[in-house]
From Swiss-Prot:
Bias-annotated ranges (Basic and acidic residues): 145-158
Any one Gene Ontology cellular component term annotated for this protein: cytosol
Source organism: Prochlorococcus marinus (strain MIT 9301)
UniProt-listed HAMAP family: SmpB (MF_00023)
Pfam families per UniProt: SmpB (PF01668)
Protein name per Swiss-Prot or TrEMBL: SsrA-binding protein
Superkingdom of the organism of origin: Bacteria
PROSITE patterns in alphabetical order: SSRP
Broad class of the protein's primary localization: cytoplasm
Length: 164
């Protein structure tokens, strides 16, 4: 009986490990993120190969609601280099996100507020599944960005002074 419990333990550790494949640093600069959520993503085989090779760009991506589903738009996943052009995917195709109905309704109600949008923050491997982190945020104005940069530089100076 002890042998089986060890096997279960090792499998749960694998599921908790994740490998970052792509990150959208620009979104963290452009938006004040108020809420994040993890979602699955519906991909083709060649898209999975490209993402595992780090060929995904989340910078211009955003999410939209259609027919009770949430779609990821304008995310560029480069075609896989070792596959012929006939079998490759469209780099900018719309991709369906896999969320529970309650989560979709909650996200939709959050984005109906003025200025709120859903942006992809990161793509990562969780076990053998590719997951995406979405952020609900409001666009920052220029003066907000300047204040953030000032605060960041002040924190940097304080940390460097404390290290001395």
């Amino acid at each position: 009986m002890a042998k089986n419990s060890k096997k279960v333990k090792s499998n749960t550790n694998k599921a908790n490990n994740f490998k970052l494949l792509a990150e959208n640093r620009y979104a963290k600069f452009q938006y004040a993120i108020s809420e994040t959520i993890e979602a699955g993503i519906e991909l083709l085989g060649t898209e999975v190969k490209s993402i595992r090779n780090g060929k995904a760009n989340l910078r211009d991506g955003y999410c939209s609601f259609r027919d009770g589903e949430i779609l990821l738009l304008n995310v560029h996943i480069s075609p896989h280099k070792n596959v012929g052009s006939f079998f490759n995917h469209d780099p900018l195709r719309n991709r369906k996100l896999l969320l529970h109905k309650k989560e979709i309704i909650k996200m939709k109600s959050n984005t109906e507020k003025k200025g709120m949008t859903i942006v992809p923050l990161s793509l990562y491997l969780k076990g053998s599944w590719i997951k995406i982190t979405l952020g609900v945020g409001k666009g920052k104005k220029l003066h907000d960005k300047r204040q953030d940069e000032k605060q960041k530089s002040i924190k940097k100076e304080i940390n460097s002074a404390l290290k001395r």
